[in-house]
Amino acid sequence: MFVIELALKFSPLPLAVQRKKLEDAKALYNTVRECLENGHPKLLELNCEQLKDKKIAVLSSELLAVQIYEKTAVGGGIKRPGFSFDE
């Protein structure tokens, strides 16, 4: 399972959705990254493959950063919220 995490302006907690395949996760990451580069406000609607009913709608102008990482089973797959420099 791969997690795509979004950091928002003025929000200490990130938004996150999950993808089962790396290719799908990379495609979503690239879509969000293009919105960040473009600079024009756009409404992004994201869904989660882990929790089928989870949907997020966010205005691209409110995004600061996006990251992708693999959710591992080691340690229960728990990662502290937010971006980190840990490898």
Curated annotation (Swiss-Prot):
InterPro entries: UPF0367. Belongs to the UPF0367 family. This is UPF0367 protein P9211_01391. It comes from Prochlorococcus marinus (strain MIT 9211). The lineage of its organism: Bacteria, Bacillati, Cyanobacteriota, Cyanophyceae, Synechococcales.
